[in-house]
Swiss-Prot record:
Reactions the enzyme catalyzes: cyclobutadipyrimidine (in DNA) = 2 pyrimidine residues (in DNA)
Subunit-level organization: Monomer.
Pfam families xrefs: DNA_photolyase (PF00875), FAD_binding_7 (PF03441)
Gene Ontology BP terms: circadian regulation of gene expression; entrainment of circadian clock by photoperiod; photoreactive repair
Protein's UniProt name: Deoxyribodipyrimidine photo-lyase, mitochondrial
Lineage: Eukaryota, Fungi, Dikarya, Ascomycota, Saccharomycotina
Any one GO molecular function term: FAD binding
Coiled-coil residues: none
Alphabetically ordered keywords of this record: Chromophore, DNA damage, DNA repair, DNA-binding, FAD, Flavoprotein, Lyase, Mitochondrion, Nucleotide-binding, Nucleus, Transit peptide
């Protein structure tokens, strides 16, 4: 373990503070061998492309087609919450209530439950951030209270084994089935759940489907995408790997299934009833272990309001006061020009269908202009929501992108420099490039940076420092409160020119131009790099020299990329 001391500004106090972080930086250099002892190879990845290996999403859909719902000897219906921690417009929860009401007609003693399953090994393997986990735990407590008003108990199950075990294992299947049997007293249970599109999660669901029997029936639903993966294809029936034509088809699809003149998406709303006659609220006994929080400065814990109502309120405020300025302000580093909804979307506290519905009402019923360049601010906001769908669609079609591999397999030949000292300086905001350092320090202190910030720092790491983009992708996942694997991998692939619909390899962000364009008065930089407050264009002695010369490092990157591609 290496101790790194970072000097940075404090966003919530006027004076400079120091932050001690004890951190193992080597964990970002590769997949965790404890969980992935045999990582996928280029050959293995190509098996998905040449169809010699079935894609997990295809397997899930194939298994589900064989299913038939039976209420015989069933006493319990249960919704399994995952990244959908909400009541309003939740497809799986809505279906669970509908199945329960059907079951009640046959069995008056039937029960309706909800469950959330904790597997700390999944969190470790997937590098979920402490910021995000704190938000999730707060959201679960709030969700439990909301469900209590409906007399629906929310159970919290913890999966532990003597050895490190992911949820896509036979041990988890046995654990899950046993837990369900305990709740239903040995009778049948119907489980509803919304699909998660990462490869590990899909293989977990495949194992469960392959092991279901008359005592356990599983029903999986598409929920996190406005348009489910696989429904948008080219005229030849293939999957899009470029966003713009996909987006135009996405808009066409959404418009074709428009619910009404005021709502473009169908929402799934459950009735506010008392679903169980007897009900007892049992507080959770789980506390987040310190290992997930030790690299976060406790004095800086300032989480957003975790409630579902807060998400809805934030959407209303954004559309009412800020969305009209979105085009001009979303990239500015010193302004809060974004919606602030990303953590609510990632954890499922708000549905993207609801977001698009509300935004649709603000743009005269047109979610896209005839010419994309003429998109209004609100239309471009909707387009950003569509990007999330796009990256999920891509992850389903190219599953190896959630297995530590780039979409463009030829970029595996790039000869990265992978300087560990330079990587640590990038992580801790000590590169000597003010805009990069300000962004990275803000990430450490708050768990959030906007999309422009992510693009700037990703370009600098992969192009100017020539460090494998996957190191940075893992760092972001471990530190972002809104970390979403498909969007994170997609964004890093774009900036490093290794991914889907990526920028050309010869496009390298100029850090000076980025700073002048998105922080022209150095308001943001001076907030997070206080060493520069009184520098008067001179580099202060207590601020590091640049790790690289921007011009020379750009030329080096072009040569290395060209040699590989």
């Amino acid at each position: 373990m290496k101790r790194t001391v970072i000097s940075s500004s404090n966003a919530y106090a006027s004076k400079r503070s120091r932050l001690d972080i004890e951190h193992d930086f080597e964990q970002y250099h590769s997949l965790n061998k404890k969980y992935y002892p045999r990582p996928i190879t280029r050959t293995g990845a190509n098996q998905f492309n040449n169809k010699s290996r079935a894609k997990p999403m295809e397997i899930v859909e194939k298994l589900q087609k064989k299913q038939k719902t039976s209420f015989e000897n069933v006493s319990t219906v249960m919704h399994w919450f995952r990244n959908d921690l909400r009541l309003y417009d939740n497809v799986g929860l809505y279906k669970s209530v509908a199945l329960f009401q059907q079951l009640r007609q046959k069995n008056a003693k039937a029960k309706l439950y909800a469950v959330y399953v904790i597997n700390e090994d999944d969190w470790r393997a997937h590098m979920d951030s402490g910021w995000k986990l704190m938000f999730i735990m707060g959201a679960l407590k709030n969700l439990q209270q909301s469900l209590a008003e409906l007399h629906i108990p929310l159970l919290l199950w913890e999966f532990h084994t003597p050895k490190s075990t992911l949820s896509n294992s036979k041990e988890f299947v046995e654990f899950f089935k046993e837990k369900c049997m305990n709740v239903s007293s040995g009778t049948g249970t119907i489980i509803t759940a919304n699909i998660e599109y990462q490869t590990d999660e899909l293989y977990r669901d495949i194992r469960l489907l392959e092991n279901e029997d008359h005592r356990l029936q599983l029903k999986y639903y598409h929920d996190s995408c406005i348009v489910a993966p696989g429904l948008i294809t080219t005229d030849r029936g293939t999957n899009y790997s470029v966003f713009t034509p996909w987006y135009k088809k996405w808009v066409l699809y959404v418009n074709n299934y428009k619910k009404s003149t005021s709502e473009i998406c169908h929402l799934h709303i459950i009735e506010p009833l008392k679903y169980n006659e007897t009900f007892e609220l049992k507080p959770f006994q789980y506390s987040l272990p310190d290992e997930f929080l030790q690299y976060i400065p406790k004095s800086k814990w300032c989480l957003p309001d975790v409630s579902e109502e807060a998400a809805l309120s934030r959407l209303k405020d954004f559309l009412g006061t800020k969305s009209s300025k979105y085009n001009n302000e979303k990239d500015m580093l010193y302004l809060g020009g974004t919606s602030g909804l990303s953590v609510y979307i990632t954890t499922g506290r708000i549905s993207t269908r609801l977001i698009v519905n509300q935004a649709f009402q603000s743009c005269n019923g047109q979610i896209m202009s005839k010419a994309l360049k003429d998109n209004s601010s609100t239309q471009n906001f909707i387009k950003e929501v569509a990007w999330r769908d796009f990256y999920r669609h891509c992850m389903c079609n190219w599953p190896y992108t959630s297995m530590g591999m780039p979409y463009r397999l030829d970029t595996l030949d790039i000869k990265w420099e992978n300087n560990p000292v330079a990587f640590e300086k990038w992580c801790t905001g000590n590169t000597g490039i003010p805009i990069v350092d300000a962004i990275m320090r803000k990430l450490l202190y708050t768990g959030y940076i906007n999309n422009r910030s992510r693009m700037i720092t990703a370009s600098f790491l992969s192009k100017n420092l020539l460090i494998d983009w996957r190191w940075g992708e893992r760092w972001f996942m471990k530190h972002l409160i809104d970390g979403d694997s498909s969007s994170n991998v997609g964004g890093w692939g774009f900036c490093s020119s290794t991914g889907i619909d990526a920028q050309p390899y010869f496009r390298v962000f100029n850090m000076d131009i980025q700073a002048k364009k998105y922080d022209p008065q150095m308001i943001f930089v001076k907030q997070w790099v206080p060493e520069l407050i009184s520098s008067e264009n001179k580099r202060p002695e207590n601020y590091p020299k640049p790790l690289v010369d921007l011009k020379h490092s750009r030329e080096r990157a072009l040569k290395v990329y060209k040699d590989a591609m």
